[in-house]
């Protein structure tokens, strides 16, 4: 996604030179979000020939030499560049001892899972995050028996506070999904998953959705600075990497946000769309900072969930609506200013809240907590 968008943005902004787009997968570029949102695929409607983009599929980058200004491919060819944009994305975190388990990151992953759904196997999903919930939804819709195993004590523990994640626990039960929290997988055996307490779960298939890490291992020894923790490319606020003429966008790169006073690593579609536009501007001589309001969406268990912004544990939580009902929102406030918003079945809240966050608007708590009052009307 991010690589394709970079190429398109460069042409839109007037770059007339050669563009080479390397893709590790052999398939034409496609949109990743539908892979978990129903295990479908969506090819990009991009005329690469018309854009005069040299699309090289099935070519993995294995090394970078900033001194020589070359990228080495898996076949050993050193490909020269004047400017380089790193958009290698992220790779799924694997489960030790579960080599036969399915991931859900690539087109091949989706193709491998389709017959599993068609056969209506008993499925065990490891991870109750966004991807786990979305695939559990698709599996239940296909008629599969589904068990979700989560090491934390609640769904979405890494993304949302306890009081919100707990509200989502009931969604699993309503959908007929057996959610097991506070436990981990000890072994994956033919036809079964064994938990650490000895419980055996029937499993015709196992799907692992416990997160992803930036795909930056190929940059070892290149001099490109990586975050010591998450191994993301440490881009600056113009999306420049630490070596000359190199930029980084999408899931593989983190950047400093002046808006939030933190370095952000965003593994979501909207970031892979917006970041390349800024990188293209700056690569062509512009000076545009990148400081978006993060946004993503998820469809799970019959609910449309949207999130915008970036919260911190110190932010004040403000509820809009009944969280036991079909539609509600949560606002996070910092010194009265809206910093983030989660909307369940309330897309207008999200649309208005995103604009309020962008302009740094402060909210009056009383009307903001009233779901009958438009969120924008609560702005001071």
Q: PLM ranges: what are they?
A:
Residues 64-79, 189-200:
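Conserved beta-strand-loop-beta-strand element in the redox core of flavoprotein oxidoreductases
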Residues 363-380:
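Cysteine/selenocysteine-centered motifs that mediate thiol-based redox chemistry or coordinate metal-sulfur cofactors
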Residues 1-55, 136-160, 352:
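Beta1-alpha1 glycine-rich phosphate/pyrophosphate-binding loop at the start
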Residues 57-68, 93, 181-191:
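A conserved short coil-to-beta-strand element within the FAD-binding core of flavoproteins
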Residues 39, 122, 130-186, 292-297:
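Rossmann-like dinucleotide-binding cores of NAD(P)H-dependent redox enzymes
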Residues 99-121, 192-194, 200-278:
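FAD-site-proximal beta/loop scaffold in flavoenzymes
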Residues 252-349:
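Mid-to-C-terminal Rossmann-like scaffold of FAD/NAD(P)H-dependent oxidoreductases
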Residues 86-142:
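Glycine-rich dinucleotide-binding loop and its adjacent helix/turn
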């Amino acid at each position: 996604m991010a690589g394709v968008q970079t190429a398109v943005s460069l042409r839109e902004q007037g770059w007339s030179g050669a563009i080479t787009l390397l893709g590790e997968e052999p398939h034409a570029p496609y949109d990743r979000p539908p892979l978990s949102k129903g295990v479908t695929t969506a090819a990009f409607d991009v005329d690469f020939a018309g854009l005069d983009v040299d699309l090289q599929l099935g070519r993995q980058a294995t090394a970078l030499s900033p001194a020589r200004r070359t990228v080495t491919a898996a076949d050993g060819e050193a490909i020269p560049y004047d400017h380089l944009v790193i958009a290698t994305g992220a790779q799924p975190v694997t489960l030790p001892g579960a080599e036969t388990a399915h991931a859900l990151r690539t087109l091949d992953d989706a193709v491998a899972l389709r017959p599993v759904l068609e056969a209506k196997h008993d499925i065990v999903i490891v991870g109750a995050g966004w991807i786990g919930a979305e695939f559990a939804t698709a599996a239940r819709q296909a008629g599969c028996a589904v068990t979700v195993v989560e090491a934390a004590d609640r769904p979405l523990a890494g993304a949302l506070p306890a009081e919100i994640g707990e509200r989502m626990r009931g969604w699993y039960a309503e959908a007929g999904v057996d959610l097991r929290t506070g436990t981990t997988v000890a072994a994956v055996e033919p036809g079964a998953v064994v938990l650490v307490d000895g419980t055996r779960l029937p499993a015709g298939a196992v799907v692992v959705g416990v997160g992803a890490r930036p795909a930056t291992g190929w940059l070892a020894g290149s001099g490109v600075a990586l975050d010591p923790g998450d191994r993301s490319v440490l881009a600056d606020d113009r999306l420049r990497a630490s070596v000359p003429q190199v930029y980084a966008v999408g899931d593989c790169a983190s950047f400093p946000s002046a808006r939030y006073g933190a370095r952000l690593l965003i593994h979501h579609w909207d970031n892979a769309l917006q970041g390349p536009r800024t990188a293209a501007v700056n690569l062509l001589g512009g000076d545009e900072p990148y400081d978006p309001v993060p946004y993503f969406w998820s469809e799970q268990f019959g609910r449309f969930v949207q999130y915008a912004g970036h919260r911190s544990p110190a932010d004040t939580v403000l509820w809009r609506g009944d969280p036991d009902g079909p539609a509600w929102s949560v606002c996070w406030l910092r010194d009265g200013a809206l910093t983030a918003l989660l909307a369940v079945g309330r897309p207008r809240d999200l649309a208005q809240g995103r604009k309020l966050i962008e302009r740094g608007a402060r909210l009056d708590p009383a009307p903001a907590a009233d779901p009958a009052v438009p969120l924008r009307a609560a702005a001071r």
